[in-house]
Amino acid sequence: RNGLPGPIGPAG
């Protein structure tokens, strides 16, 4: 979602 490969959302 946010473009960060973290717990918030996948990269993209």
From Swiss-Prot:
It is found in: Secreted, Extracellular space, Extracellular matrix. GO terms for cellular component: extracellular region. Its main location: secreted. Keywords: Extracellular matrix, Secreted. Type I collagen is a member of group I collagen (fibrillar forming collagen). Trimers of one alpha 2(I) and two alpha 1(I) chains. Belongs to the fibrillar collagen family. This is Collagen alpha-2(I) chain homolog. It comes from Crocodylus siamensis (Siamese crocodile). The lineage of its organism: Eukaryota, Metazoa, Chordata, Craniata, Vertebrata.
